[in-house]
Amino acid sequence: METPIADFVRRYADSGMVRAHMPGHKGKPFLGCEALDITEIQGADSLYEAEGIIRRSESYAGELFGSGRTVYSTEGSSQCIRAMLYLALTCGNGSRTVVAARNVHRVFVYAAALLDFEIVWLWPERSSSLCGCPVSPDTLERTLATLPAPPAAVYLTSPDYLGGMADISAVAEVCRKHGTLLAVDNAHGAYLRFLEPSCHPLELGADLCCDSAHKTLPVLTGGAYLHINRAASASLRESAKTAMAMFGSTSPSYLTLASLDLCNRYLADGYRDRLREMCGRLEEARKALTAAGWQVEPSDPLRLTVKAPAGMTGGQLANRLRESGVECEYADLDFLVLMLTPENRAADIERLLHAFGTNDAVYAPQPTLPLARGERVCSVREALFAPRETVPAARSLGRVCGAPTVGCPPAIPIAVSGERIGPEALELFRRYGVKQVEVLR
């Protein structure tokens, strides 16, 4: 597969041209990658008005992902999430309401405020972690049935930070029935397209989807995709670049663009086989950890989510692994998360298993968290643009939340802008070590 962006950048780096243009390093080595770090010079195309090498590269990515249109982001899925909400607003059914599973990335809350959306939250029936918000199609059906009109979109995060995956197919069917778009934050699941069978949200019926390529594919940090489904309206496909330009920098990283471009060749050249092999290794690792006394939680195939046993936190377990030369993705009171890809060697997994060792401690039942369904005092937008102050979390009871407070992104916010902070929120602040919160004055 051609790599037009990477090829252009390399040719320019070797050309000996006098760089009388940005950036200021002029290709001289400071970190070592500067020769390949260029700007929108003649022939380099322009990310938001792509007609040349970027357009060609994005079309190759669209073919690989089976989308109606795929566009690049150099600012992660954060930019794509904002763009998805903009598209739902401008190309949807005219509603200014969005229905969202509560475990959103905070950028969703900020985007909803900027676009003046009202948010109707979907809550889990029970939850043992703020990272997960399993929502059944029946729960969504009941929620949509109570609304006076269909929302602009239903928004889900899948996989979540612990690797939990939503039933996208069933949720998409409910969305079609009610005439609303389905947008999925698939930041942690770009690779899902290449499983057999594919379980990528586009394949399962999502209208809009964002993938953080950099999280699970060999792409530099910030590289991401916004995908539009083939069956989606033409207006969604045609407006994708406008939506991205609304929220993106006019100085996109060509290093990141080149890495997205090279990733197309990587995906086309035997990636499915390498992915299948790694998924098999990780399944064997799950069995080995279970046999060694560890409780391994269900998750997407490239993630190991291990519950901390009684007397130990996930953070302490992470320290134990770190001392053996293994750095994890995430740890909290209850869980440890490790993310691996085909770029990890078999020796990495052996080292990881050795670092875990054997667990002889018992596992206590996981308590159900007291989810804080705070009283809505004002809209998210009103709260975020109102004067605020920072107060100790322990003294915030009864105050109105100014900025969304989360233990980690993406996760169920303990309190969202415009909600009154109640006793349950205080308990969660204490549990997750939140010391300060922003509240309205």
Regions found by a protein language model. Name each.
Residues 72, 121-123, 211, 330, ...:
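Structural signal for conserved beta-strand scaffold positions within catalytic alpha/beta enzyme cores
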Residues 1-52, 180:
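N-terminal "arm"/small-domain region of PLP-dependent enzymes with the aminotransferase-like
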Residues 68-70, 95-98, 414:
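Short active-site oxyanion
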Residues 2-10, 76-295, 308:
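Conserved PLP-enzyme active-site core in the AAT-like
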Residues 44, 71-73, 154-157, 337-341:
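Short glycine-rich or small-residue beta-strand-to-loop segments that form or flank ligand, phosphate
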Residues 34-79, 103:
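Conserved N-terminal alpha-helix of the aminotransferase class I/II PLP-enzyme fold
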Residues 116, 434-441:
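Short, compositionally biased
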